[in-house]
Regions:
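C-terminal structured interaction module
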Residues: 183-247
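N-terminal cleavable signal peptides for secretion/export
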Residues: 1-57, 63, 71, 78-85, ...
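A short, polar/proline- and glycine-enriched secondary-structure boundary/capping micro-motif
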Residues: 50-53, 79-88, 106-112, 225-230
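Short, solvent-exposed aromatic-acidic interface loops
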Residues: 45-47, 73-83, 100-106, 219-225
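Short, hydrophobic/aromatic-rich segments at coil-to-beta transitions
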Residues: 2-10, 35-41, 65-72, 93-95, ...
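Short, surface-exposed linear segments at secondary-structure transitions and domain or protein termini
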Residues: 63-69, 113-126, 210-216, 233-240
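Hydrophobic alpha-helical segments, especially N-terminal targeting/anchoring helices
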Residues: 62, 175-176, 206-208
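Solvent-exposed helix/loop surface patches that form functional interfaces
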Residues: 2-21, 91-183
């Protein structure tokens, strides 16, 4: 019998003009069976203007090669709640989507060819596609991303959009977080391969060596997301990580 074992856990803080407005705690689990899957579990908390807490729980299961298999996003705010689910059949590339919200249950499915990522509110999964498909050191790398606008009520089916990642330093860069000196992979994420000014400005991501999860990211508008705590269980999984970190 396989067992899901914890390999990484941590916490992100979300900042606007240096002030924290949200936080995310996460755990990454690995199935101990041969060619076992990974599970990313995240909880996001944010106080809204009414004083209530918006709570979002994300479960993101991938294959051992980091292809998405099952994704669940549960949102709750006061009396409102909704659930999104994606189920992926990797053999025929069929994606089954279900939304349950204030206006009932909506279902549809679609064939999606090639490699793809599924966008969620969980920051820990924001660069997961770089494990599924490595960034090209010489060129901008494109990724197909599925996303929806469905939050409390059903708006429409998921859409496919390309996002582009560009490596900014082949040898990595040194950054400081919580008085710790860290080595990170610096890349920029944008909606346009040529940084067209009519598109939104790119965001700077600094990726860790722990399954490429971000140490931090800087967005236009003086927005920042960064690791507040991070523990990698390297003693048990020394072959997966190049170094050990505890923040």
């Amino acid at each position: 019998m396989s067992i899901d074992e914890k390999i990484v856990e941590g916490k992100y803080v979300f900042l606007k003009d240096g002030n924290q407005y949200s936080e995310e705690t996460f755990t990454i689990l690995m199935d101990t069976a041969p060619n076992g899957n990974y599970m990313y579990k995240s909880e996001i908390l944010c106080r809204v203007t009414s004083g209530e807490f918006l709570k979002i729980n994300v479960d993101f299961e991938t294959s051992n090669s980091f292809d998405p298999l099952n994704v669940k996003v549960f949102r709750s705010l006061g009396e409102n709640s909704s659930t999104e689910r994606y189920e992926v059949n990797l053999k025929d590339k069929q994606v089954y989507y279900t939304f349950s919200g204030m206006d009932g249950v909506h279902k549809f499915d679609r064939n999606v060819s090639g490699k793809f990522h599924i966008s969620t509110p969980a920051f820990v999964t924001s660069t997961l596609m770089t494990k599924m498909k490595k960034m090209n050191a010489a060129h901008v790398t494109s990724y197909n991303v599925l996303s929806t606008q469905n939050i409390w009520t059903y708006e429409k089916q998921f859409v496919e959009n390309d996002v582009f990642l560009e490596l900014k330093s082949l040898g990595g860069v040194e950054i400081k977080l919580n008085d710790k000196d860290l080595h990170a992979t610096h890349c920029q994420m944008s909606e346009d391969a040529y940084n067209n000014p009519e598109k939104s400005a790119p965001a700077d991501f600094y990726l860790s060596k722990y399954l490429n999860i971000p140490y931090k990211a800087e967005f236009p508008g003086n927005l920042e997301v960064k690791i507040d705590k991070l523990k990698a269980f390297e003693n048990e999984y020394k072959n997966m990580f190049k170094s050990w970190l505890l923040l």
